[in-house]
Each structure stands twice: as C-alpha cells, then as structure tokens.
C-alpha cells in the first residue's frame, strides 16, 4: 500500500470532478514541516494560474470533491493554496498492523513487470579487483535487488574484461609457470603480482614478447591449445571475483558472467551492418561513425571509432554487440549500466548509435547510471600509502578486523563464533553503507572512523537499531517473528513512527525509477532515529504500562525491525540477532 499514490489518485479524481483539465497534476509530496499536515498537494497553484482564478478557490473546489473519508482526520488550505492532509491515526494503526504482518511489508508486485538487464561490476580479469570496482558492484547489486523486489524480471550481466591483447602476454606467462610444474590456482593466487611479472617479461624479453603477440593472433583465430590456457586463466580469475562477491554479499554468480569474449563472433557483423546502412565510413584507415546528435558547442560531430586501422575492435563495438544481444535475445524492456562518470560520452555514443542502427527501439530505456570516485583523505583517488592500487580483498579484510575490535570493546560477552559473524556483518556492512549512503553521482572521501561509528547515518547504527528491537522482544519474552497485536496510536511519536514505517513502498518506487540507493539509506536513518525518539518517549517494558499499550508498541517496534531488515537487505547488508 503506497500512501503517496493513494492520496495522489484521490486528489487527481477530485481535481477532475472540480473541472480542472486532466493535464494538471496534484503535485503531492510528503510535508516538510511539522504542522503542515503529513502530506501536501500543491497542484491548485498551477491550475489556478492557467485558469486565471484564485488558487485558494481552486484548492477549496478540490477539497469539496475530495473523498478521504476514513483516511484523513483533517484536510485544510494553507498559504496561497497548499492543501495539507492530516492522516487519521486510526487508519494509520490499521495499515500498520496489515503491513507489519504482511510478507512484503505492503509492497505489491507490479501489474506490468518489465524485463530489466543490469550491467554492473564487470572487472578486468587480467588483474585483481580493486576499490575502483566497489561502487559499480554494490550500487548495481542494490538496484537489482530493489527491482526484483518490485516484481521485475532482472537479468544480471557481468560484462567482464576477458579478451584483448594483454591476454597473449598473460597466457605466455601462465604457460611458462605451468611448464615448471606450478598449478594454475597457485600460479594465479596473486593476480596482481602475476600480471606485473608477465609485464616485466614482456618488456625485458623480446622472445617472450614475440610469443605473446603470436598468442594473441592464435587466440583470436581459435587455436585449441592457446584457447585452453586462456580458459584456465579465465576460470581462476573468475574464482577470485566470486570470492569477493561472496564477501560482499553480492548476488552475482557464474551464470551472470557474459564477458567481452562472448561477442567476438558478433563484432565483424556489427561493423558490416553499420557500413551497409551508411553509418560507418572510413576515416584515416579506421572505420568511424560521425554522430551529429552529440555535436560539441562548435557543431563538430562526436566521433565513435568502431574498428581500428589495424582491424582491431574497440569497446564501442563490443558494447554495441552486447546491447543488440540484450534486446534481441534477452528481450529487455530496460537496460541499466552502472559505469563510472568518466564513460558518459562513450555510453551516449553507444546508445545513440544503437538507435540509429535499429539495434534498439526508441521506446527501449537505455540508462547510464554514472557514479563518482572514492577518494582518500587527500582528496585524490583512494590509494595505498605507497601510491598503489588498494585491492578490494584487502580492504574488506581490514574492515572485518577493525569491526572486530569495535564489537569486542562494546560486547566482550560474545562467543568467538558470534564475534566472527558480527564482525563480518558489521565490517562489510559498514563499507557498503558508507558508499551507498552517498549520492551516487558525487565523489566521497573514504574514512574508517566515520563508517564504523555506531551513531549517525552508518551501517553499524542501522544494524544496532535492529538488534535493539530484537533485544526488547527477548526481554519481553516474546517471539518477534510470530508476534501479532492490534495497534493504537495515541502519542505523537507513535503517529510519526507509523507514518515513516508506511512510507517504504514510496521509497522503493523512487529507487526503482531513479537508481539512487542513498534514498533508502536516508529513509532507514530517519526511521531508526524516529524509533529511538519513540522508545524514549513511549515506554514498552516499564512497570505500569497497560498490557494493550505494551503489545501495541511491540507491534509497532516489530514493524520497524522488519522494515530495517528489509531495507538493509535491499542494500545487500545483513542484520544479526545481537551485536
């Protein structure tokens, strides 16, 4: 049950009955100031301007036709024509019981679910995953979870970099190490070191470099032995990535991997088709497309190179092939790409060219959801102290170690097994939440102290709020999972908490449309903060609290806990019974 949509539909119907043209919107939103109702409809002003009449008169006509019987306790006009809607506590109480006892917390599946392809993570298999891969991986995964929760069919695509000239060098190095008796898993246990060693041999040994270049040709022509070595390198590299995904609690699996190599046979046909349509032309030996739709301020067209002078293909070619596959084979209605902001022009070129070539229909939604960079305290891209790339595995291990110290200080009574579980969930959750709570398009500064804090808008604070409610139920000798009670909202803190609790469907709907996970973080923080205020003002377990009041407040608390757990789960963050 989506309160905003319900009220919007009722106000829209009232506007129609009041004779207001259908193209005017109710402009319904959550009220930002206390005393101005719980929701506010601001459409009267725009309609009045067009109708050349007094906005308060228009607002009154809307109210005269507005049916919110049993939903609102009061509807009033404020200022120049704002319509303030005060929700009825009795109705809120009924909705709270229904929602907190429902399977999906009142979120109904879509009437018309879409097939959504999401391209995210997509590391280069030649190297270990580093912090630069974190944002795409966890933001993309959060949106995949949200869209599945709404009922969409989500197809994850991990477009890994498993092809290219560097693989000749890596295969030659792997062959040398296997020839000396090394097992693939051991040879590649340090992917970064392996890459550096291969690069050194390539730079220092002309014979090795010649063999590496020869292997590129053989790999591209389908040589069985070289292909076998490449498959082995790819297999072990993917195991590295899958271990990171497991630590991060990310839903990507082996079945979601469809790398650049999957499109090898499609590249030449894509170029040929673009040439046949007159879109691709030869320019200085290369094959390019001039995109006047993306012209610069001087009117010069944007140039997309689809085949190099030496016959090699580029990312734009494989991305076009991938997009055509996602439309033609996967039958996508919507395609989302989580790739950093530096690739914005590239993605615009791919989308524009795909439509010009007929690979994607005009109605298809192709969306590049860009993101900023993780920065160090110096304001520069996050690096090691020596200036090297920070490996993601090392970052996550350090997060768990730091979390263990914090948790051990706060709760030394935990068993070693409990400590390990809590430290893992708190540490990984802290890293993910610190990233996801920032507006996706902004850069942000990585800071251990703030992300592991147990107060403020942090992962540990959200997890703590959940465990605190679990603790309340244990002290009440009640099983939260099976507990059910009527709700009676008499105190303002109860009413405000119930309203916030019931707004989850609005939040999920917004994230599904805009792909900004920080909206969920802000919502959960507001919910947790309102719960703490409610808990201080409205006793639950104190002596003298009437049984009906106690059970009502326990039911409200259960709703908060379930919403916190669900919201965090949609972000890929786990909760625990105690911490």
From Swiss-Prot:
Residue span of motif 'HIGH' region: 123-133
GO molecular function annotation: arginine-tRNA ligase activity; ATP binding
Gene3D superfamilies (alphabetical): Arginyl tRNA synthetase N-terminal domain, HUPs, Isoleucyl-tRNA Synthetase, Domain 1
GO cellular component, one term: cytoplasm
Pfam families (UniProt xref): Arg_tRNA_synt_N, DALR_1, tRNA-synt_1d
Enzyme class: ligase
Alphabetical keyword list: Aminoacyl-tRNA synthetase, ATP-binding, Cytoplasm, Ligase, Nucleotide-binding, Protein biosynthesis
Subcellular location field: Cytoplasm
Subunit annotation: Monomer.
Protein name: Arginine--tRNA ligase
Upper lineage: Bacteria, Pseudomonadati, Pseudomonadota, Gammaproteobacteria, Cellvibrionales
